[in-house]
Structures are given as structure tokens and as C-alpha cells.
Amino acid sequence: MLSQTISEARSFLADVLDFVFPRHCTVCGERLQKDEQFLCADCLLHLPRTGLASAEGNEIEQLFWGRVDIQRAMSFFKYHSASNYHRILMDLKFHGKPEIGIFMGRLMARELVATRIFDGVDVIVPVPLAKSRLKKRGYNQSEMIARGISEITGLQIDTRSVVRTKANVSQIGKGRQQRQENVEGIFSVADSDALKGKHVLVVDDVLTTGATTISLISEIQKVCDAKCSVLTMAVASN
């Protein structure tokens, strides 16, 4: 009886808060229903998913061929700066909303777990941020996505074994070669024993040329015998 009363009180309070402080869809701006989070049902339905999880040798994996050795790679949805779905990344990276990263991580994991992309993975390594950017933002957006994935899959997150040793300038506006040069030597493996013999899932927010991820994986594979796969929330689309 008491538990039912508490549950009803919580539901009533949630209704009041939603009335006073209505929540809106990140993508379209429409008011969210009680059971919706961040994205309304329509925007969630039309999220431009890549559908690449079950396709070995897909276009995401091909970005890494001949550059680093990977097991699997895929991105969850396609993003373009002119699309309203760009707002997901903007809120996560620049508008101080880490919770949307956790939400997207959960969404990705729920939809992808049946594709077996997580099979054999031992640990998740979110791409580290430079200390200066972490201090400014207050959180690592890739770690937020990783947290959501971890909640659904049970995979552990390792934020200590790989560190970012310097802050590179923004990749925005740079070509492929410039991007690769910009990220050379920015990572270091602090604990190779923790990753030795493991299958590491590298998680990041958005994939463009793959330069940052390649730099990180190269550093891991220089110092320890580890398999690596890649999962990003989004991939830049022309």
C-alpha cells in the first residue's frame, strides 16, 4: 500500500514538473510526451540510422583498412550540419547536456545488441578529451555515450588506460591529411597491462575521416596485443 502511494506521488510530481517545465524534442522542438526522452516518437522513428551493424566490410570499416587493424566498425546514425539531427551533437558537445549522450548510448546498445557487434568485447574505451577541454566542458561526451552502452550491455568502461597527452586544435575545416597530422601523437597508453589481450571497443561521438580514432588505436596496438573495434554515435554525411 505504501509503495503504491509513493509511486502515485512520484507520478503526480512528474506530471506537475512536466506542466511547469515542459520538455521539448531535441530535434524538432515539439513538446515531449510523458514517456518520451530527448527525442519525440516521430524523430526517433526517422533517425537516419546507418543500418551497418550487420554488414562486415561496411563503409565505416573501410575507412580503417590499411591504416590500423580492426575487428568491427560502425556508426549508429548519419549526421549532416544542415539536418535538425545535428542538434543532438550540438546539445551533447556544446550546450552542456551530457544526459543526451547517456540516452543515445542506451538507444544504440538496445538496437545493436542483437546484431552481435558487442560479442567478444572485453572493455569500452571512450576517446579521451584533453584536460583543458574536459575542464571547460565538465564531462567527456564520448564517456557519456559509453556509460549508456555499459548500462545496457554490462561492459566495463576504462577511462584510465589511455590518456590524451596534448590538446590538438579543432579538426573543423581540415582536410583528411591535415586531420591526420593534427592528431598524431596526442594519445598515450598509461596502462598496457590493463588492455593486453583484450578486445577493446573504442567509442566516440562522431566519425569524419577516422583520424582521431586511428591515432588512438595505433597507440594501443604499438604497446600491447589488443584487438580493437569502433563504435561511434554518428558519422558525418555529405
Residue ranges of predicted features:
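Glycine-rich phosphate/pyrophosphate-handling loop used in enzymes and phosphotransfer proteins
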Residues: 1-203, 208-238
